[in-house]
Every structure is written in structure tokens, then in C-alpha cells.
Amino acid sequence: HVFNGNFLLHLLGSTRNVTRKPLHEENPGYMVTGFCLGLQSMNVAAGGTLWQDIPAQVYESTKPETHVLINRKNLHRNYWQNIRDDKDFMGINMHPVSFTDDMFFGKTVKVSRKMQPIVYSSHHQAINELAPVFNVTARSDDGKIIEGIAHKKYPNVFSVQFHPEVSALYEDRALVRFAPDDTPATLHSMLDKKSLQFHKKYWGHISKVIAEQAR
């Protein structure tokens, strides 16, 4: 992670060293993106900070037994697996995110900003202080967790806190459940039609940028 952070600092610039010219200035359209830890690394490298534990620092919950009492829409991993030994429990959570008024998702990715897609999350850290070079593009259901960021200057520097790359989102695989009373289901079946469409549009945007840069 130290290597990644140093590389991103030199690439994107940082409030931690304002005298250093970002390497990105030589090619402002170059794409840099990331998922989960990638978003966190980009934010820290550029001068932001992290919550080290979401349940404890954001929701004032100190143990798994109280973590699971938090509204499921606002959990970013599954703490039932720390309470009960059940091989069917998924270690992650599927929850909705909301888009901000930033133009990234609405005009760049071209999805409705009113959409609240279901996403795959597996993390306990999150952005606390946002690096000044970024805008927030998405938030958790209650608005407390930053779910997406985009660079204010470089159009192809963006990242999300969730995991759109997980192949089980796009086809039926193992049956899993979040809570003891849930009926086991595939991750793919947990996505509604609009959520699946969102994931495909997001990948479509990434593919478009890569194709343009390969010309």
C-alpha cells in the first residue's frame, strides 16, 4: 500500500507536497480508476484521510452484536459471520448508493442521478476528510459514507468504494445469505434490473475511455 500511495501522490499531486508537479500534467486525459482500497488510496495520496472503522467511528458501535443492529442499508460488510458460524453467510453486503449532483454519473456515465443502484461492498474503512482535488459523486443510503469520487481537473480520474468487478454479480453462482433469517440467493439475483444496468453502464464508460486512449 505504501508503494501505491507514493505512486499516486506523484501521479495526481497532493496537498502533502504542493511544490511537486503532478506527473498527470503531462497527460491530463490518462485514466486512473480504482475500486474499494483503490478509492481510499487515491484519496489519502491526494491529501485526504480515512475513517479506520466505520461501525465504531461513524455509528458508535463497538462489537458485532451491535453492528448488525445498524440499518442493513448502511452496513458495508457482513458482521453476522463474526457472531455465528454458518458457511452460507456472505462476508459482504449488497446495499444501495445514491448519486450526488456532480456531473460524473449523470452526464459522463449517463445514468439517471435519481437511480439508487444496489452495489457489492466489503470494507470497514472509508473516506473521512476528502482530498481537495476530488468531488463526491456518490454516497451511502444515509449519506454518511462516500461511495464515489472524481477529480476536479482530470476528467478520467475517478473511483468507487464498491466492487463492480465481481463476476458473481453478472451470473448466478453460489447461494448465500446475509442474515440468519434470509433465504439463500445468488448475488446476481440480489440485483434488480436497473442495478445490473448501472453496473454495465459503468463498465461501458471505463471501456470507452480505454478504447479512446488506445487509439
Question: PLM ranges: what are they?
Answer:
Residues 52:
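Short polar/charged helix/loop
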Residues 4-30, 55, 60, 65-215:
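Amide-donor transfer/coupling interface in amidating biosynthetic enzymes
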Residues 22-49, 163:
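Catalytic nucleophile loop
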